[in-house]
Design a protein with these regions (language model features):
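Conserved "HGTGT" condensation-loop signature of ketosynthase/thiolase-family condensing enzymes
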Residues: 1-75, 97-101
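Short beta-strand segments
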Residues: 7-10, 80, 110
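Active-site nucleophile and cofactor-binding loops and adjacent substrate-binding regions
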Residues: 48, 106-113
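Conserved donor sugar-nucleotide recognition element shared by glycan-biosynthetic enzymes
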Residues: 52, 56, 88-91, 112
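Short, flexible active-site-proximal loops enriched in glycine and acidic residues
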Residues: 72, 86-89, 103-106
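Short glycine-rich or small-residue beta-strand-to-loop segments that form or flank ligand, phosphate
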Residues: 75-81
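Short histidine/acidic/glycine/proline-rich micro-motifs that form metal-
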Residues: 82-83, 113
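Short Gly/Thr/Asp-enriched flexible loops that form oxyanion-binding sites at enzyme active sites
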Residues: 83, 87-97
Length: 113
């Protein structure tokens, strides 16, 4: 019987940190208002030209390295995100192409917190 497992974990976050105080310049809000309602103090923003697929590909490569596996042993790619680079193709297809494993299944799950 085949069993699924998570052999490695990877993540990728943008370098740019945007604090609540920076948002005060663009909208009628305050650090206190945001923190009291969401608990959020800062967030990461990508630079122009960087897409969800760039972060997903970087995270995938880190997970593959951690797992110490050949990407060709992967059977399925699932990407969970509410943001995509394009309406079509999905981010999973871009990850699949970047990893060079085009003969397997890949799909996106639209999800947010």
């Amino acid at each position: 019987m085949n069993r699924a497992n998570i052999a490695g974990i990877g993540y990728s976050v943008p370098d740019r940190i945007v604090k609540n105080s920076e948002l005060e310049k663009y909208m009628d809000t305050s650090d206190e208002w945001i923190q009291s309602r969401s608990g959020i103090k800062e967030r990461r923003w990508v630079e122009p030209g960087t897409g969800t697929s760039d972060l997903a590909i970087d995270a995938s490569r880190k997970a593959i390295q951690m797992a110490d596996i050949d990407p060709k042993t992967i059977d399925l790619i699932i990407v969970g995100s509410l943001t995509s680079d394009y309406f079509f193709p999905g981010v999973s297809a871009q990850v699949q192409d970047a990893l060079g494993i085009n003969s397997i299944g890949a799909f996106d799950v639209k999800a947010a917190c």
